[in-house]
Each structure stands twice: as C-alpha cells, then as structure tokens.
Design a protein with these regions (language model features):
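Glycan-recognition and catalytic cores of secretory/periplasmic carbohydrate-active enzymes
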Residues: 1-375, 379-414
Length: 414
C-alpha cells in the first residue's frame, strides 16, 4: 500500500510485496489464462477493493481504529476517482496515482474483447478491467464489496449512492470508447438481470433502490447453477413483502436439490486436477443461501470474501458457540428499515433450549424494543437478548433496531 497516492501498488501481492511485472509463471495454464501474459499488473485496480474484507476481519477481531480508518480512506479514494469519471470506477490507476497511466491503448492489450479498430479509453483498461474479459462483472463486483464494507463500518449512505450510480450506468451501458465510425463502445453485460443491485435495497430498505425489480413476477425463476442468486433473491424480497408465501418451502426444496446434484457431480467427477481448482465453488455440496435468507435475514455473501450483512445472528449459550441450538428453528418472514419479524421454535419434545439473538451478524445494530404477537413491547437498548424455549414451544417476535449504529465486532455476546 502506498499511502501517498492511496493505492495498492499491484493486482498481485504477497509476502514479497507487490509484483510489478507479470511473467509466464504468474499466468501459466491453458490458453484461456495465458492471454494475460505480458499484460500490465502494475498499479491499482478495483479488484483490490476486495482486500477491504481482509482488513475488516482485522478490525472485527481487534477493534483497532487504524483498520477502520484505512478501509474508509482507501474506499473513499476510489469514490473520488469514480466521481471524476462520470461515476464509473476506473479499471486502473498508475503507480503515480493517475488513472489510465499504464494502459494507453487497452484495445491493443485485449484483442478480441472489443470491436476491431476501436479507440478504448485508458481508464477502461486494467487486469479484469472494463475492456477485458468479464470486466462488467469483476469491476462492479469488487466495487460492491468495498462499498459494502465501508457502509458496514459507518452506515454512511454515500457508499450506497456510489454503488447505485455505477450500477445505473451499467444498466444504461458504460461507454468505454468509440469505434472508427464514431459509434460508442458500451459495456452492460446483460444488466437487465442486475443481480448485484439487490444489495442496495436489502441493505438500506429504501424503495428507490428497487429499479431492478421492475416487472418481476415471483416464482418464475428456475433452479440452476449459473444465476448468481438473482431469481431466488428477488423471490425472497417478494416473500418479505407478502407476495410469495410459498417461498420458504420452495427454497428449502431447491437447496436440498442443489446439495444432491452437487454430491452426484463429486461422485461422478472426471475432471483434471487443474480444472478442479476452478470448479470447487460450483461443486461444494454445502448450501447455505436458504439458511442465510430465512434465518438471518441476510443475502448469502459472495464467494469473493464478502461479509454477512444481515439482521440477526444466533448463539447457543449452553455449548458456547455460534449458531442455533439443537432442535431450534428460525424463520424471518418480514423486514423493514427498523424492524425484523422472526419466529423461533423448539422442536425438541423433552428439552428446553435457550437461544441468544444478536442484532446484526457482527452486532452492528442496536436493539430497541422486542415484542411478541400477543405481548407488550419490552425496551432492551442492547445488542443481544436471550429467549428460553420450552419443549415444543415457539413464538413470533417483532424486533426493533437502529441499524448500523454500532461498530461491527466478531466478539461473541458474552
């Protein structure tokens, strides 16, 4: 990290520091990967915003302000560059802090990915940049992670507004250059799907961030492996608003199907070792998306290292660990800006269970009142509370909270 220019000096970093010159050894493998050989790895890239999750972990464990301050400073630097670039996060920053410094003609460095003869803007270059393979996904995906981490630490709406501006640009088509005939070269990547934009609404609960939900009809998605959670996340939002009451059962059925399907892939695997490395996340039979949505009130975090941003987290005080106690089920069925509704049930026929309910995955929210469907509200002014469930008993709770009012911590609530 270069504090003077507020950049990470390379896209490839390790114990020996930043790698400023790519070699064949760095990009070895099939032809699909070796087209990167000789491309410039010097300077910063939006992909490095994923490093904020590493620093967030350090803050969550230590509570040292220097880690929080670094995430805010580094992320704000990228927001400043995006603002100066029409709210498009540039794909590269040179070692001198200037955008586009080491990518004078991205079209020459990525033949085949842009129309021949195009004049691509230097800011659109970069490893996994706008003008390269998959840039429409890698750039905003990494930006999304950095902005979410900064929002988790601060609750400052500017981070969500910056994400919204970039995603709306993608929806309309990001202009990254011009063809010889003067027509623009645009990137949108099929953004009618807008699968990244869902975080905007789920984190803020602001109606203006539902533009990606236009004309959505609940239940129309088909279970598959390549949807990035787009369909079921939209259906989950519909369920939370009362439009799709069958969602929990359908989602559970889908999750079981996915686990069975992936176990079958493992049992019948004929792939090569080098192929298997890239396919691990598609073959993992552990399926957590249904549990994240329906018990935590959280969208499943991305495989890139994103933190969980949700309403609730559970702990078992008897075993001294995180998670729901044995035989205890939880179902979040409604959320708004300041409240979450959850039903807790003890399925055991002979054992009483105690579950500690925390506001936020990392205690980033403050509890206000808690009320059962048939009871009076109780003022808590804390970050967690305990519920004792008798055998075969359950209760629905409305939990009021002031969201993102506390600094996130990985500490358990005892």
């Amino acid at each position: 990290y270069d504090p003077e220019h507020n950049i990470i000096r390379s896209v490839m970093n390790g114990s020996a520091g930043p790698n400023l010159d790519a070699t064949m050894e760095d990009w070895g493998g099939s032809d699909f990967f070796t087209h990167w050989v000789g491309k410039n790895v010097r300077g910063d890239t939006p992909l490095n915003l994923q490093a904020t999750s590493l620093v967030l972990t350090a803050f969550g464990l230590s509570q040292e302000a220097k880690y929080r301050d670094w995430i805010i400073k580094y992320t704000d630097g990228w927001i400043d560059r995006a603002r100066e670039n029409g709210w498009n996060f540039p794909g590269n920053v040179g070692l001198n802090g200037k955008v586009g410094e080491d990518w004078p003609n991205p079209a020459e460095q990525f033949p085949g990915y842009v129309p021949e003869g195009s004049d691509i803007y230097p800011w659109a270059g970069g490893i996994m940049g706008w003008s390269g393979w998959g840039g429409w996904g890698f750039v905003p995906g990494s930006v999304r992670m950095g902005l979410k981490n900064a929002y988790l630490l601060t609750g400052d709406e500017k981070y969500m507004r910056a994400m919204d501006r970039q995603l709306q640009n993608l929806r309309d088509g990001v202009k990254i250059g011009e063809r010889k005939n003067g027509r623009p070269v645009k990137v949108n990547g099929g953004w009618q799907r807008a699968w990244m934009a869902m975080d905007l609404y789920l984190i803020t609960m602001r109606p203006e961030y539902t533009w990606y939900m236009k004309d959505w009809k609940p239940g129309r998605w088909q279970p598959g492996e390549g949807t990035y959670g787009m369909g079921w996340t939209r259906d989950w939002i519909a369920y939370l608003s009362g439009r799709y009451p069958e969602f929990p059962e359908n989602m559970l059925d889908w999750a079981l199907q996915r686990t069975r399907r992936r176990i079958a892939k493992i049992e019948n695997d004929e792939s090569k070792d080098w192929e298997r490395k890239a396919e691990l996340r598609h073959n993992n039979p552990v399926t957590t998306c249904a549990l994240s949505m329906l018990t935590l009130g959280a969208r499943e975090p991305s495989w890139r290292g994103s933190p969980v941003i949700g309403r609730l987290r559970y702990f078992d005080p008897e075993r001294g660990c995180a998670g729901l106690p044995p035989n205890v089920g939880a179902l979040v069925d409604k959320m708004d800006d300041n409240n979450v509704w959850v039903t807790l049930v003890n399925l055991s026929e002979d054992a009483t269970r105690t579950v500690v309910v925390q506001a936020g995955a990392y205690a980033e929210h403050s509890l206000g009142t808690v009320q059962t469907d048939d009871g009076e509200p109780r003022e808590l002014n804390d970050q967690a509370f305990a519920v004792v469930l008798r055998p075969g008993c359950g209760q629905r709770f409305r939990i009021e909270m002031d969201r993102f009012a506390q600094r996130p911590s990985f500490a358990f609530p005892w």
